């Protein structure tokens, strides 16, 4: 009898953990967190575990007025549409912040799966972030220390920043078939930066015509573990004096990059490590 009660209790627990997850639609192309049907509203009100889809008909772009904080496990499917700040390359806020840069001890791990969309980010050099003084970290997506990002079929364009105009990863990231093009930075990592202790996995990704004035025209890896498989690096550039790593730059103890079947063409730097 006790075993039967235990099984029933377990079943109820499992059911309760997923019962409120939903499939939700974004139906409006602009608006803030207080307006039903917008992306900020749907994310803020979605139960954990929900799948959110952009459903905007023939319209091509969803514009957000401020950074969307991801504080629960979610999947967002862009359905081939674009998610943009109000003024790409100009607006001083990110698109997504996943978890927190300084979470409390024992904070819950927050996971975002993001797929099938183009992301137009802003100008991170003027970005305001009240949670961390590292405001210049990423003009498009910041993955906090208790955050993880799984990205599939994403395109990152237009953004500029200090560190990593596309993604600043302080938590683990896994990207498949993603494209970073035309992004620019003034510190390390024109498109992407993986921070200390992070594991980054990149499969079939393309880094094209990204620039930086310090180190890592496309990617900077700082004390992180990284795996690049079937990726393409082309036309990435470091322009500053005494700068290194036209495509990938490794810094700090423990930084590593395993590179398998990747292609490097026409990347350049002013000092060491063209590729």
Regions found by a protein language model. Name each.
Residues 53, 69, 75-77, 84, ...:
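Extracellular beta-strand solenoid repeats
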Residues 27, 32, 161, 259, ...:
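Conserved beta-strand/short-helix segments
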Residues 20-145:
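N-terminal, post-signal-peptide segments of secreted/periplasmic proteins
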Residues 65, 89-104, 126-143, 160-168, ...:
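Extracellular beta-strand/beta-solenoid scaffold signature
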Residues 79-82, 108-121, 148-160, 172-184, ...:
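Right-handed parallel beta-helix
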Residues 1-23:
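Sec-dependent, cleavable N-terminal signal peptides
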